[in-house]
Amino acid sequence: MGGYMNVNKNKQVIIYYFTALISGFCIMGIETSATRILSPYFGSTTLIWLIEISLIMICIGIGNYFGGKRADKLVKTRTCEERIVKNLLISFLFICTVPLTSKIVIMGSIILASEVQLGNIIMISSIICSIVLFSVPLIFMGTISPLLAKISITSLDETGNVMGNLYLFNIFGSVLGTMIPTILVIPKIGVKRSFLLFGAVLAIILILYSKKIKKNFLLNSIICVLWLCMSLYLSTTSLAFDKPVHEEESEYNYINVSQNDDGKLALKTNVFFGAQSIKVDKNKKKSGYYYDEFVKINNLLDDKVKHKILIIGYGTGTMSTLLHKNFDNFEVTGIEIDRNIVNLRELYFNKSDDKIIISDGRNYLNSTDEMYDLIILDVYQNISMPINLTTREFFEDCKAHLNRNGIIALNIGLGNSLNSNLVLALSGTLKCVCPNVYKYKTKSDNNVIVYGSEKNLELSLKEQKLLTKK
């Protein structure tokens, strides 16, 4: 009889460990997906990650606190399991509503922050969105761990072992919840459908518990199936407010191809702010955007048979297209980390024979011996920026790959002024590497171009009207 009870007890504990794993998987999956669903609207800066991580830790802490209080009041194992089912059901319902309500909540939070003038609109809006969309399911998910501890520990002698195993499975689930959405789920089915996947996983575990305690099994099963089907049917995978020409989510970016107000196709990696590439008209040598001023940098190079230009942040090749239309004495190497973006060049944008390398810009520089006359860094904007391409060491790597009198040119987007914190920080860091640094405020798009070189470029920049006085 004792052997049978031990086997039965072991089976129950295994279920509890599995629940801890699923809990960790869903919590970290929500964190990863939450950042991805907000980044097209608010960017993917450290600030957004800070908000998401802080919110999740606070919500889990609140859930742990109240879950522990509740667990102490529940004497029987069955009542604890009933509470787990209820909390999982609430989390499931709220997680599955994220695809339905995210756009409304995001737009509402932006309007609220703008109207009330609460300060940093992006920061305040993202905080409001995070609280409204994710706090409730995360708090209820946070109650699961203390409830599991309550029913898993049957004697003080095994407390350490049981708690260690619960933590182990929870952490393992967290690792899976971090990796699987980023690498597999989001690129394949999109970030909105990923929330439905987490909901489906929770539905499975709560239905298993309902069957185990023999209470509301049929009702909970019907609720889960109907709610999932409704969310799947009513929600769309699109994150844009209008209807884009093309939309997808890659391992690195949200990708949107749509028409600008002037009718030109534009590639965007966000919903509200700017464009990363545009399609240049076949019979025109100008785009009507800041690129027209940027490509005049080619005139600053020393006369020679052929210039070699490196573009880090190639996108779909707008900069290169305009260079080819206006000059013929150069060759371009383009570095772009996102293969999906490069693939769109052939489908929607201008074709070229440029050498395109799928790589991180810094990794490429560290793995090549090629030298260039001009290195263009088109990767900087307020809401999304690769931090590894902002350091002194990176600019030193760039300089090490410049020919004599070569130029480093930074394009800093999204309405920065000459004295904005971002422009001052990047130009100051570049100044540590290049003795001559200059800034230019473009007439269109409000971008800032920062140049760095060993050579004094002031007269040449004035001749080309590419220098803005402070």
Give the ranges of each region predicted by the language model.
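Class I SAM-dependent methyltransferase Rossmann-like catalytic core
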Residues: 277-297
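Extracytoplasmic/secreted cell-surface and envelope-processing proteins
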Residues: 294, 384-386, 417-421, 460-461
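Alpha-helical transmembrane segments of multi-pass membrane proteins
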Residues: 2-247, 259-262, 271-276, 299-308, ...
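Flexible, glycine-/basic-rich loop-and-beta segments that form/coincide
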Residues: 455-470
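ATP-binding glycine-rich phosphate-binding loop
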Residues: 248-252
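Short, surface-exposed beta-strand/loop micro-motifs that present aromatic residues
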Residues: 253-258
